[in-house]
Amino acid sequence: MSFIATPQFMHFDEPLPLQSGGSIADYDLAFETYGQLNADKSNAIVVCHALNASHHVAGSYEGQPKSEGWWDNMIGPGKPVDTDKFFVIGINNLGSCFGSTGPMHTNPATGKPYGADFPVVTVEDWVDAQARLLDRLGIQTLAAVLGGSLGGMQALSWSLRYPERMRHAVVVASAPNLNAENIAFNEVARRAIVTDPDFNGGHFYEHGVVPARGLRIARMVGHITYLSDDVMNQKFGRSLRAPTLPAARGSLPPEGTDPTRGGPASDRRDYLYSTQDVEFQIESYLRYQGEKFSGYFDANTYLLITRALDYFDPARCHDGDLTRALAVAKARFLLVSFTTDWRFAPARSREIVKSLLENNRDVSYAEIDAPHGHDAFLLDDPRYMSVMRSYFEGIAKELKTTERAGGAA
């Protein structure tokens, strides 16, 4: 059973310098905490979120039993990241649409929503903002920083920007930068949004519209990259979707549809011979995912976050030499990859491992044979969960040893 989570907010009126050369004059950060901070404040873990996630990492909200956090299977009492042992902090990134200051919020200079005027933010900017929140909470050193996908990039960035403030970095299903293919996927998604007639140059709020068509397509493109070929074939194959009434064409699947499969089961064998209707179950599934996403995510946030992904490249300032870039890191590392993840393939994690080893850093690496593609980092694969549990149990033992040594002194 899930525990009750409570969102919190912290306001900052000290300008935050940005990598772009600009700044954010004042801003709010949304966050949640789970567990208890110990007496010497040494058991804190920051969890960094991926593209469409938030600070709501674990637990459920009061009276909303279906509101479980996006990594609730990983974090909580008795779970791999055990909140009976750790004080876990989930922080919503700047530019998001889930509570922290972002494009939907009012620009104090104009009295209108920022929209496209919200400054471009980077992974490094997010990490700097997170560090400021920890300062407010009185936490100087973290037991670990943990993240998957884009969150893993933030964990890696933490080890470079604040090497003295963390003991462990746990980087899951991530990469040291995006390759050209991933940048291309992001660009296709962004073009779908900015060419939507309702986008209005990013200032659609004041027009009372949402570029839903562009968001739907962006999500459909992105979702394809999160799944593996094996999973897509197993779930959908070439199965046809049951026909719908003409009035329902192009709409959400009808009531009773299983959205995880894309549409009601169909034993029909004939094609509709139409270029407009939903013919295959995979089409229905992608449309469902796009429709759902466009109902809760902000278009400007999508543009900002995908561009932050594109820009992340710690080796860039070191002539492309990742080993030189990682030389400042002092944390111990766990990296986890998944064999069928083609968005951030295992070879990308091995690049990080190799560079850390060349710097004589303490590194553990697990490559999990899982069929689920990039989304595997969110799922309950027993081998994956065992690796995570074992590593965090080791961190908990370190903390106990340190506490005993402090008490003896």
Curated annotation (Swiss-Prot):
GO terms for cellular component: cytoplasm. Pathway: Amino-acid biosynthesis; L-methionine biosynthesis via de novo pathway; O-succinyl-L-homoserine from L-homoserine: step 1/1. Substrate binds at residues 219, 375. Pfam families: Abhydrolase_1 (PF00561). This is Homoserine O-succinyltransferase. It is found in: Cytoplasm. Residues 244-268 are annotated as: Disordered.
